[in-house]
Amino acid sequence: MVKKVLVVEDHHDTSFLLCRLLKTEGYEVEHAIDGMVGFNAAESAPPDLIVTDIQMPRMDGIEMIKRIRGSKDISRTPIIVMSAYGKRLIDDALEAGADAFIEKPIDLDSFLATIKSKLPSV
């Protein structure tokens, strides 16, 4: 069964790279440009895992995580957070309910290993 990953990232180059990498690895991938679009996408078609940036327009990743954790249908979806902005944001994201944190710039091998470790088994 193909696993679905939702990538929530506002920077085009980063989202393009991550989506392409995940598709190459055999995942079904959906992309959202900010936390609001990401939350709505996750609610309407729940993914197996969410990868999100923290700092985005309209709704940031931390607010999106809080809403997901408060949502009945998607509250247990694993969430991996990406950011280049240091320890305070890492702590905020983990406190909000993120399951893992990846620093930018992203090491692609580490990224894929984290994805595989957080996806639920079938």
Residue positions per predicted region:
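Charged docking surfaces used in two-component/phosphorelay signaling
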Residues: 16-24
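Receiver (REC) domain active-site loop signature in two-component systems and cognate sites
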Residues: 56
